[in-house]
Amino acid sequence: MKFFLDRRKRTLLLFLILSVFCSGCEQKGKEESKEEQWAKGYDLPVEAGKENEVEQECLIVVDRISDIYRYGNKGEGSNIILSDETLERMQEEIGKLGYPVATSEEYCAMVNYEKMDQFLQECIDGKKCSAVLYDLSSSGGISRKEYTFDGSEMYLLSAGVGWDNSYNPIVSYVSYTRIDEWSYTEKGWFCYKLCVPEPPEVSEIVDGSELIRVIPLSEECKVLSEKCVYPLCYMENNILCSNWDTENLRTIDYNAAYEYFYNMKYGERLDPDKYTNGIPAAEFEDVIMKYLPVTAEEIREWAVYDEETQTYAWANLGCGNYTLSYLGTALPEVVDVRENEDGTTTLTVDAVCEMFIADDAMITHELTVDFKEDGSFRYLGNKISDNEIQNIPEYRYRISRR
């Protein structure tokens, strides 16, 4: 009996020792896991009280714009696309609360941008500070972004807000991430890269880059950006991403540029089903000559043209005639305007690229334009800075030239 009791005591003692040991190992494992998580910088833990505070603020703020969203213009398709007017009304309403507010509109002017500018200037000075920004998407989603700088590292506490079927706001997520690197440019762009999972933890590369224009463009630059460069961009034609002038117009990809000039002239996209057998010469040449100083004879010589059918070839963009590049995703932005002695105007344009590189001037080029009194204009040339020409990927013509 005594032996049995001693054995029970020894077993109990051993159990207690193992429990303490395992508990210590578990605690150590949790500490190591927590340290590893903070080292990675993403999916960081959010204090329960802070998370609840953020969620409640989001619901209160976004509830102010629920009627604007509910009755606003959401487009005619199955996917919601809010009109610029609706987005601007939502932006203005939240801005009344004093928050900086941006939207997904190209060349958007941030409301209450002074607060974000002050925050970033204090970060540059090494001061501990924070700022909250609301970001409105044309899809109807709202993001609350709280940036915190501790004097050394910057963090982003982000919350996403959507809508239920009754147009009530619902918080879809709250996340906390360290910002791996950031900068605030002279032009007023806040550029940063978030810490994100990397291979082999994930099978595909995750892009944590983001660009936010804090200091708005001047009204003149905004208008000229919308009128002269945004309709073209860099993806599917070479008007803005190659060197050319009135003495060297043969390198332009006329067959690709046509659909963008068509959109500029008529205010609607080209219907590809209408031109399966090519574009009639008169239509093609009329559109091209409206925006470029070329003759019909020159277009027929330099573009892909069928003399027998008197049509110009056209094809949709696809993997067979386009190579994806960072530049192709960039947003052209007019940053300076110079009036020339001959009456023409030269626009200094920066290619703002968010994808992976977060660069507010991937390339800089000068676009010369001839504006007429009736409001029409022609492009006369484009020159890329000599030290940046190497950043231009080789252009693939939409349709192979013979």
Language model regions located:
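C-terminal motif of bacterial Sec signal peptides marking the signal peptidase cleavage site
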Residues: 21-24
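Bacterial N-terminal signal peptides that target proteins for export
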Residues: 2-12
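Bacterial signal peptide processing site
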Residues: 26-28
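Mature, Sec-exported extracytoplasmic domains of Gram-positive
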Residues: 30-402
